[in-house]
Amino acid sequence: MMYKVIKRDGAVTDFNIAKISSAISKAFDALNKETHPTVIDLLALKVTSDFEGKIKDGLIAVEDIQDSVESVLSQAGYADVAKAYILYRKQREKVRNMKSTILDYKELVDSYVKVSDWRVKENSTVTYSVGGLILSNSGAITANYWLSEVYDEEIANAHRNGDIHLHDLSMLTGYCAGWSLKQLIQEGLGGVPGKITSSPASHLATLCNQMVNFLGIMQNEWAGAQAFSSFDTYLAPFVKADNLSYREVKKCIESFIFGVNTPSRWGTQAPFSNITLDWTVPNDLAELNAIVGGKEMPFKYKDCKKEMDMVNKAFIETMIEGDANGRGFQYPIPTYSITRDFDWSDTENNRLLFEMTAKYGTPYFSNYINSDMEPSDIRSMCCRLRLDLRELRKKSGGFFGSGESTGSIGVVTINMPRIAYLAEDEADFYRRLDKLMDISARSLSVKRTVITKLLNEGLYPYTRRYLGTFENHFSTIGLIGMNEVGLNAKWLRADMTHEKTQQFTKEVLDHMRERLSDYQEEYGDLYNLEATPAESTTYRFAKHYVAQFPDIITAAKDGGTPYYTNSSHLPVSFSEDIFEALDIQDDLQTRYTSGTVFHAFLGEKLPDWTSTASLVRKIAENYKLPYYTISPTYSVCKDHGYIAGEHFTCPECGGQTEVYSRITGYYRPVQNWNDGKAQEFKDRTVYNLGASHLKNERTVSHTAEDGKHKETPKASNGARVMLFTTKTCPNCKIAYTLLDKANIGYEKIDAEAQEDLTMKYGIRQAPTLIVTDGDGYESFVNLSNIKKFIEQC
C-alpha cells in the first residue's frame, strides 16, 4: 500500500522506510550497541505493521510513526534502545523549537517591503507604511512568543497545521472591549500614575476630545474593536446644559468623527471603534438624572429627546457628507436599535438615517423586535447574575462592538472543512470536532490566565484603571466553512443551499453550544459561539489545505483563488432574492451567541430613503436574526467624489477609482483586500430587490415599550419590599441610598447567596426591586425603574 506522511509543519511527503531504519540505527549507535543491518530492517518492517491501523485516507502522521518505533523496540526486548530513541526524539524536538524561535530578520523585513507575503494584506485596515512595517515586525516576534513560550505543543501545532486559527497572535493583549461612556463622563480621562489626568468634561467639545483620546489609548491595549454604548443618550445632556445651537453640536460631532478616523493606532491604523445609538431614550436610563461634568443635573435623560435628535442629526449628516474627497468614514461603525417603538414616520432624522444607509451602508441594525435580545442588555453585563454556569449568554453590542464592561479576551476559529474532508462518517466528524474544541477551549483558558497576570502587573494601565478585571469578558470559539463541510463530507456532498446540509449545520451548532456549556463549568469562564468574521482566516485555511490536499473542495470556482465561505453562510453566488437567503439564514444565525450578522449586499445604493427604510423594517419584523446591514457597493474618484456602484475607472474622467465594499464587517477599498477575499468579491451575486419576494409578510404595529405606561404600584404597609443586589454591582449602592432617603423599608437580598428567592422571582440582574403582597408581585428591574417606583410612592 502506498501512503504519505504528514510532517509537523503540515507538509505531506512520500513515506520512506529508510528513514525509520536510520533513526533506529542512531539509537543503537548512541549506546555503542552493535547489531546486524538485517535486524534493523526487520524492526523497521515491524514498525510499519504497528502503525498500519493509524493510516487514514492514505496518510500517517510522523508522530504516530515515532510512537510505533518506541513500542516495537520495547516489545522486541530493546528497552534500553527504546529509551535512547526517546531521548533522541526529545533532542530533535529541542532543535526544532530552537529553530522556530529564531526569526530571519532579512526575510521578515523584505517580505513586507516587497509585499511578497500575503499577510501584508492580512488586515485591510493596515496601510502599507512604515507603521505597518513596525507592526509586522513586532507582530512576528509576539506570535513566536505565544507559540513557542506560552502555548504547549498540541495547541501550537494545531494552529501551525491549520486545524484551528488563534486570532491576534501578533498582540499580547485581549481581543475586543466595550467601555462605559457614563464612567468616562463621571470620572474624566486619566487616573494612571505618571500620566496626565483630565477632569470630567463639562462641555460637549471637551467630551468629544476625551472620547477620541480614550478610544486611541484603549486601542493600544487591545487587538480589536473598542466600543461605546448609548452615544446619543449620554451626549444629549451636554447639549441641553449649554443650550447649544445645532451648528455648535455639529462642529463637536465632526471633530469626533474626523478624530477617530485619524491613523493614530499601531500599524498606521485608525482606532477600530464602534458606537451604539439608542435613537429613543431607553427605559433603563429614562428616569435617571443626567450627568454633565461628573455631576447629576436637575433633569433626567428622558428630558433630553430634542437634544438627542440634534446629536443624531449631526452625526448622520457628517457621515453622509464624507471626507473632503467624498470618501465615507470607516469609523465609528454605528449600530442602531430597531425596537417595537421605533418611529418609522417621515421625519428629518429618519430620512437622514436611511439616506446614509443607502449611500454608504454605514450602520448596523440591532433587531430588538423579533430577536431574544433586550435593549438594556448592552448596559447590564456587569450586573447580570451567574447562577447557572451552563447558561450561554449573548455577547451584546453589535457585530464588532461590545456592551459596557464586556468583550472578548480572545478568538479561536475551527477549520470545519478540514474535519469534514478527513472524517469517515458523522461519528468521526464529531470526534475530530470535539478534540479541536477541547484544544481551543484550553488555549483560551491559557490566554486568559496570561493576560490576567499581565493586567494585574500593570501592562495594560488604562484597562486596569477603567475595567480592572476580565471576569465579564468572553472566551470566543468560532467556525468557518460549513458550506464547504457539505461539499467535502462523504455523507452529504451538497452545499448550504441543500436542506440536508442546513440540518446538519444546525445539529453541529447545537452540539458546539452544549460543549461550550461544559467548558463554562470546567473553567469557570464565559464562553460564546461566534460566526467568525474571518477576514484572513478564510484565505489562510483554504490556501494551506489546497497545497496539502489538492482535491479538497473550496468555495472558489475552477482556477480561482481558494477561500472558504464565512461561518454557516450560503455560497456568495447563491441568489438575487434577498428573502430566499434570509429564510435559510434565520434559523442558522440565531444559534450563535455572538458575531453573527446578515449582510444585504446590493450592487449600488437604493433609489431613495423610503425603500431603504422599508427593507430595514421588513427584515426586523419578519426575521429573528439579531444583526444585519444594508451593504451597497460604491466607488470614489479623487476628482469627482462618490459614484454609486462598482466602477474601477471613473465614468467622468476615466481615472482610477477606489471601489468600496464590506469585506467582513466594515468598508474598505477592494484593492486592499487579500487574494481570498478579492476572489469572494468577484464571485458574489448581489441582491436585487426587484427579484426578491417576501413570503407571509407581517407588520408589527407601532407600540410603546412594554411597561412604559403601566401604573406603578405603591408599597402599602403590608407589602414586602426586597432589593436584590450583588457585591460587584455599581448601581446597587445607589439604589440603597435612594430607598433610604425616601424612607422606604426594604430587605436587602444577596441575589447570589439566596438562590431560592432569586429563582422564585426570576431575578436576572441587579439591582432588582420586588414588591409583593403575598398573592402576587411587581418587579422593577434596573436603577431607572427603581427610581420611578420611589418617586411614585
Where are these regions (language model features)?
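Local sequence-structure signature of Cys/Sec-based thiol-disulfide redox active-site neighborhoods
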Residues: 711-742
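Intrinsic, low-complexity terminal and presequence regions
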Residues: 633-652, 658, 662-718, 741
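Thiol-based oxidoreductase modules, predominantly thioredoxin-like and allied folds used
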Residues: 744-756
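Conserved catalytic cores of very large enzyme subunits
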Residues: 91-95, 101-471, 492, 498-652, ...
